[in-house]
Amino acid sequence: MSFLPFDQQKPLDFIAVGRLCIDLNANEIHRPMEETMTFTKYVGGSPANIAIGMARLGMKTGFIGRVADDQMGRFIVRYLKNNGIDTSHVITDKSGSVTGLAFTEIKSPTDCSILMYRDNVADLKLEPNDIDEDYIRRAKCLLISGTALAKSPSREAVFLALDYARRHGTVVVFDLDYRPYTWQSKEETAIYYNLAAEKCDVIIGTREEFDMMERFDGQRRDDEQTARKWFDYNAKIVVIKHGKDGSIAYTKTGETFVGTIFPANIVKTFGAGDSYAAGFIYGLMNDWPIPKAMEYGAAAASIVISSHSCSDAMPTLAQIEQFIEQHRNGSAARK
């Protein structure tokens, strides 16, 4: 059953809009940041990772965003190009902005944290004039993420992209991607997240992210109640993630699916959500049953958290299928 109206006549499969930054992952693991001396540089940012994941899976992928006019910005653009991502709408910001940096601390496979440098970052300089209506018209799917809503003018640019997508029948996926350090308050966050989510076809986030969005709703909802709220707007599918306990997908037609949980040799917890999103969206775009899309998303997540990198570790289709074949014990099930 097809849940989403992907227009197969459109020439571009997938566009992501938003954050492009640098991850600096600790090489000396099992120690605090204060004692870590060396880091390895990777392209980062949830929309960037998801776009890279989609490109690795063979999708014609583009990106809309801004990078700083510095060595890190040029590194990001070159990396995207080398991964087959169209960068014609990645703009070099000339205002003196900088590239966002994320230093990761890996004390243990389950005790990881991030030290962020996000002052005056280029990705939040994205302007409405940077959003090309025809570019979005030509895409089957647009991905937005919550961090891009945190400040103007990026916030307005994302809402314009949403309007163009709805005007031209481009399916919109909202990766909630809540990063509290980017926002002024939880109240501000909830307001803009809700305004964006009302316009989206697929919403993917953790239980904690949905709780943040519902802070004005009076009482805590369970997963099914949360999903039903968004079905009253434009959502067709809502996915609520529960970390190591897996994910649950709800459809507007009333179905519920519990996702596969795969074992992993966990190195760090970062990147699981991004790789899950890429695998899941890929499945939806190929009109797979939702349980199969969830299975591929879960497998991709297990692969990435077993690796030092996020972007470099985004798997190909063959790698996901090989991983699933090796772990055939789990399955996604209709609830």
UniProtKB/Swiss-Prot annotation:
Protein name per Swiss-Prot or TrEMBL: 5-dehydro-2-deoxygluconokinase
Name of encoding gene: iolC
Substrates-to-products reaction catalysed: 5-dehydro-2-deoxy-D-gluconate + ATP = 6-phospho-5-dehydro-2-deoxy-D-gluconate + ADP + H(+)
PROSITE patterns linked to this entry: PFKB_KINASES_2
Enzyme Commission code(s) on record: 2.7.1.92
Gene Ontology molecular-function annotations: 5-dehydro-2-deoxygluconokinase activity; ATP binding
HAMAP family: IolC (MF_01668)
UniProt similarity note: Belongs to the carbohydrate kinase PfkB family.
GO biological process, one term: inositol catabolic process
Gene3D superfamilies on file: 3.40.1190.20, putative 5-dehydro-2- deoxygluconokinase (2.20.150.10)
Lineage: Bacteria, Bacillati, Bacillota, Bacilli, Bacillales
